[in-house]
Amino acid sequence: MSRFRIADTRVKILLVRLRQIGDVVFTTPTFAALRDHFPSAQLTYLVEPAAASVVAGNADLSAVIVAPRAPGVRGFVADLALGRRLARERFDLVLDFHGGPRAALLTWLSRAPCRVGYEVSGRAWMYTQRVARPRELRPRHSVENQWDLLTAIGVPPPDRGRYPVVMPLVRDTATQVRQRLASHGVAHDARIVVMHVSAGNPFRRWPLEAFASVAAALPAVDARVRVIVTSGPSEADAAAQVIRDARERLAPEVREQVLACGEFSLAELRALVDDAALYIGGDSGPMHVAATTRVPMVSLYGPTLPARSEPWRAGSLPALAVEVHGLACRPCDQRVCEPGDFRCLGQISPGRVIDAATQLLLRNG
């Protein structure tokens, strides 16, 4: 495969990853690496609205283009117009981390002389350079899979200590989150445990009653613990159920140590975790947002493997993975089990998560 070479480092580069919060987070280590390789480059990121806050305000990016997705003919016409806009930008290089039909089309419409993407049947012709599509179940980290596109243009291999995942902290948002916590009675010296109880993918949802068991156990570890239960924007009922069930197991005087503080946007969740003592959650977008902080983490893995999606950050930062070993079906394509009958997650006991959380709380207390 020929490698992209350019003598003038003032190259214009477009990075494409349209959606899936975790996958957008997984592209963020490439920003600093590209900046090191092309010191004067202009880096532009193309993303759909749901994940745009992950990359907003990143100092290594020159611009972010937010591309709403519309259905049917209207969406196709809008994409043609967006393609013309991209062509006018005269990008030298496009890296399509996404690889889906829409991303490939927009990459091709950019008319960049070098367009790097995955070897996918029916779309490979849209790229001038192609790399092998990573095998979905291969136990290799997603950051490394996406880095294959950088390898194709001569960028050195990834180093998670030097190039961790990044999501900028918005200072005003952090102030607003602290004010919200105070309004719910959370003291400034509280040891906040953020427990995210939902996942966009139903195959990655640990049972709510298990989360409730963990939430009810943690106040006994440290009287300063306050468990903030969070969920996706359409799953507030799940958070409410966990809080209700946990409080039923607690003595009246400590029931308020498990609570919700309203809904959190991605930027607000990033700020909330930044002030936390611990994050607990499954393999989901919010977990990877949490990984952009230095906060200790307990991550739960069912159909996926830590080797593929563990927090991509310096090894010195505390993070424990809880998973079940010995299941021949792991990892899987997350299409076979019936919802509610996930033996991989179902075999993770609350006790194991409580032990992991206690270990990190005591270690960093």
Where are these regions (language model features)?
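Catalytic machinery of carbohydrate-active enzymes
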Residues: 1-365
